[in-house]
């Protein structure tokens, strides 16, 4: 399996002055649109999250159509590696399923010539709980059950807790095989943040991009998790919905405010609409509890926000102009195809704050 995937789209023709004045306002776009020029350098470099890989490919294609000759070379090495490469100045921005952590904020500011780096949520997605349990087409789990499965306190599928959640299913006595991301992955942090928020009485193992459960087997990248689940009877793992759909995998329902909730575009959208920010300003870190603990009916709570980590200031003009162009197009035109790719389009209240932050990049 390749260690990195380069996503490059777009022809190499120049971008004329007409394109420099166009606005990123596609037919049917809602909310603030911002202004996207086509100035700046032709190629941006970025690295990080596998969760946003397919979204970046879509955004890249749309940017190349909107601004011919523009492209992003994006390498999917994982959120942790992406943040490290950004801080080291090796890429123009990072893709990460988690914002910068406390001990990265200072080094990131140094990389940005003494200016703060911003976490900009450009993509929302969902975490699919893929499993290998023949004869059980509609598995239901709860946050409490998940916490106990991924910490080794529920070890067989016919455990009374799981049986009570699945009264119509004949769960086997198969041993449960948890599969987690072995590489530093933002989706692991999202999963553990969800368990901490939704099942605090059952998950005390902690959070972070490294799996803390202490049980199961690790696999690298979403494709590795899917391969491991497929190859292991009784396995359960977590991947982004788009990867699960591409692989044709079954995924579990999660109990919510109105009972068992399947993972669909609508149920994920209901959770994302509850998104709130931790603070004012342009560093747009989300309060994940607003989604993980939502009381909205028919809301699938295990969602993720994946960020683009950028310098607020400190780029050269060529890089700054290109980043603003790419992000503005992605936040507008690029949202149209996200549902088909397994993502959730930006809610208007998030998009409004995002456009303001993008416009403020210098």
For each predicted feature, which ranges?
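Sec-dependent N-terminal signal peptides
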Residues: 1-6
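C-terminal motif of bacterial Sec signal peptides marking the signal peptidase cleavage site
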Residues: 10-14
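N-terminal segment of the mature folded domain
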Residues: 18-163, 223-228, 239-247
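Second-shell loop/turn segments in exported
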Residues: 42-49, 71-74, 116-117, 131-137, ...
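Sec-exported extracytoplasmic/periplasmic mature domains
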Residues: 57-69, 87-91, 99, 131-135, ...
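Flexible, solvent-exposed loop/hinge segments that line or gate ligand/substrate-binding clefts
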Residues: 100, 203-362
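Residues that flank catalytic or metal-binding motifs in active/ligand-binding sites
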Residues: 123-125, 174, 187, 234, ...
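Extracytoplasmic ligand-binding site segments that recognize negatively charged/polar headgroups
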Residues: 126-130, 136-226
């Amino acid at each position: 399996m390749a260690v990195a995937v380069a996503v490059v789209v777009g022809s190499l023709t120049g971008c004329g002055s007409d394109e420099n004045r166009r606005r990123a306002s596609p037919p049917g776009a809602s909310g603030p649109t911002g202004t996207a020029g086509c100035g700046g350098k032709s190629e941006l470099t970025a690295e990080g999250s596998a969760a946003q890989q397919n979204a970046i490919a879509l955004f890249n294609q749309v940017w190349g159509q909107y601004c011919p000759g523009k492209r992003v070379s994006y390498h999917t090495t994982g959120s942790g590696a992406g943040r490290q490469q950004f801080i080291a100045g090796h890429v123009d921005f990072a893709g990460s399923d988690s914002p910068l952590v406390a001990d990265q904020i200072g080094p990131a500011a140094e990389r940005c010539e003494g200016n703060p780096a911003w976490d900009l949520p450009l993509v929302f997605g969902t975490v699919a709980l893929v499993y290998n349990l023949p004869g059980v087409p509609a598995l239901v789990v709860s946050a409490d059950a998940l916490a106990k499965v991924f910490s080794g306190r529920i070890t067989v599928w016919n455990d009374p807790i799981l049986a009570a959640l699945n009264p119509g299913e004949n769960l086997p006595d198969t041993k449960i095989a948890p599969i987690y991301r072995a590489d530093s992955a933002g989706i692991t942090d999202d999963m553990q943040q969800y368990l901490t928020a939704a099942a605090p009485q059952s998950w005390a193992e902690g959070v972070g991009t490294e799996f803390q459960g202490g049980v199961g087997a690790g696999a690298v990248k979403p494709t590795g998790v899917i391969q491991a689940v497929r190859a292991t009877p009784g396995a359960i793992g977590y991947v982004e919905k788009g990867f699960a759909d591409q692989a044709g995998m079954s995924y579990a329902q999660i109990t919510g405010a109105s009972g068992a909730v399947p993972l669909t575009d609508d149920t994920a959208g209901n959770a994302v609409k509850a998104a709130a920010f931790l603070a004012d300003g342009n560093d747009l870190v989300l309060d994940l509890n607003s989604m993980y603990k939502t009381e909205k009916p028919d809301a699938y709570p295990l969602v993720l926000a994946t960020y683009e980590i950028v310098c607020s200031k400190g780029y050269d003009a060529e890089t700054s102009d290109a980043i603003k162009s790419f992000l503005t197009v992605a936040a507008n035109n690029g949202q149209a195809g996200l549902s088909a790719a397994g993502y959730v389009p930006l809610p208007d209240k998030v998009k409004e704050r995002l456009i303001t932050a993008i416009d403020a990049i210098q």
